A protein has these predicted regions:
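Conserved S-adenosyl-L-methionine
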Residues: 195-312, 328-329, 335-337
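C-terminal catalytic and target-recognition region of SAM-dependent MTase-like enzymes
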Residues: 308-310, 314-391
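Short beta-strand/turn micro-motifs composed of small residues
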Residues: 31, 279, 359
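Intrinsically disordered, low-complexity segments enriched in serine/proline and basic residues
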Residues: 5-6, 12-14
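Non-catalytic nucleic-acid substrate-recognition regions in nucleic-acid-modifying enzymes
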Residues: 17-157
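S-adenosyl-L-methionine
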Residues: 23-45, 52, 58-75, 129, ...
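Methionine residue identity
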Residues: 1-3
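A short, flexible beta-alpha/helix-coil linker loop
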Residues: 121-124, 180, 325-329
Length: 391
């Protein structure tokens, strides 16, 4: 006869889950280089606690509700991770003992799967595969001892462990996002040289577009920038149409996710927006339309085929944001430079338009024919770029 858990045991489990859900956690949001300040501002607007910015990541404190809210609503962060520990690790023994000391059982159940990923820079422990093995062994030994198991099945939900070792200091994280946050779930297919959704959202943010102005991307490609502009105008949370790694964790009450998603939907705006995406390639434009439909914003975007160097400006004033082709990708460098020269001449008298153009071309201003009002260095993946701002 199967044993029925006592009311006391059930109450203990419920109390444990509640305590973990309510405890204060330190979380890290990795981001593309150059976006740290923007991500910090996003978190502050969400009223996250103790936000602090470091190179390529932003930390904040909060509970599971704050974690879920960040996952659902962040536009420019790459993922949300719980910081489990930080300790010196200049030897494999130190790494093993540091990981084994982490109370992983607070999060990972007896059947939880816990793969390990990580990296090491400027450290004595430079072999990433060896470090992965040590972290995994320490986690197995810890959980096995806590659950009284000599073998862990790992047949349940995934609790992705991540580590970083920098200058002999190890940090261990629990990844709550699963798939990176830049994957919104709307990219049905992509064309050559796509722009990360998080970077596209950053360009829209830098342009200060909020839905009132006319918005135009003359090189719209697969539509990422105009789709992110529409999501911004609608104040629609980018994570509403995707799932997250922590969404089915036993330690996170389902009510938390339901609450933050309902909250996000209640914050959406309703209105008419003037957003235009143009591209010279009809096949690419078809991809953009498909992506916009999948994102649920196709009715807010006008897609048209056309040459950016010949199209008439749609109106006297507006916001132009674009990622034009440059030499590292689709065009030879000279062709890309000539394109910028022609495009710059075409926009010579467009003084009513604020322009935000991202490019890896070091001499962009020379070819465009005008000094930028302001420049900002960013990385599109590993490619160093500048955002040239004209206003």
């Amino acid at each position: 006869m199967a044993m029925i858990p006592s009311a006391y045991f059930i109450a203990e489990v419920i109390n444990y889950i509640f305590e973990v859900a309510m405890e204060r956690l330190t979380m890290a949001v990795p981001c593309l280089f150059g976006l740290e300040g923007l991500v910090g501002d996003e978190l502050r607007r969400m009223q996250m606690e103790n936000v602090r910015v470091e190179d390529r990541r932003v930390f904040f404190d909060g509970d599971f509700e704050a974690m879920a809210r960040a996952n659902v609503r962040l536009r420019m962060g790459e993922r949300v991770m719980i910081l489990l520990a930080r300790f010196p690790a200049d030897s494999f023994e130190a790494l093993y003992q540091g990981v084994k000391a982490i109370a992983l059982e607070r999060f990972i159940p007896r059947d939880g799967a816990f793969p390990v990923k990580g990296y090491s820079l400027d450290s004595k422990l430079h072999s990433v595969p060896d470090c992965q093995s040590i972290v995994k062994k320490a986690a197995v030994d810890r959980l096995g001892a806590k659950y009284g198991l000599t073998w862990l099945p790992e047949t349940g939900d995934t609790y992705q462990l991540r580590f970083s070792i920098m200058k002999d200091v190890c940090e261990v994280f629990l990844d709550t996002s699963g798939v990176s946050l830049h994957k919104r779930g709307y990219r049905a297919v992509g064309n050559e040289a796509p722009l990360h959704e998080t970077m596209a959202a950053a360009l829209v943010n830098l342009s200060r577009y909020r839905g009132r102005d006319f918005f135009w991307d003359p090189f719209c490609g697969s539509g990422t920038i105009v789709i992110e502009a529409a999501l911004t105008a609608l104040n629609r949370a980018p994570g509403l149409n995707r799932s997250f790694g922590a969404e089915h964790w036993s330690c996170v009450p389902q009510e938390v996710w339901q609450k933050v998603k309902t909250e996000a939907r209640d914050l959406e705006y309703r209105g008419e927006y003037r957003i235009l995406g143009t591209d010279i390639d009809p096949a690419t434009l078809s991809i953009a339309i498909a992506n916009a439909k999948k994102a649920g914003v196709a009715k807010y975007i006008d897609f048209r085929e056309g040459d950016a160097t010949k199209l008439s400006l749609p109106c006297d004033t507006g916001v132009l944001v674009c990622n034009p082709p440059y030499g590292e990708r689709m065009l030879e460098q000279r062709s890309a430079q000539q394109l910028m020269r022609t495009f710059g001449r075409h926009l010579k008298f467009a003084d009513g338009w604020k322009k935000y153009i991202i490019s890896s071309e070091a001499e962009f201003e020379h070819f465009f024919g005008r000094q930028a009002t302001k420049k900002r260095k960013l990385y599109n993946g590993r490619l160093q770029c500048n955002v040239y701002m004209y206003y």
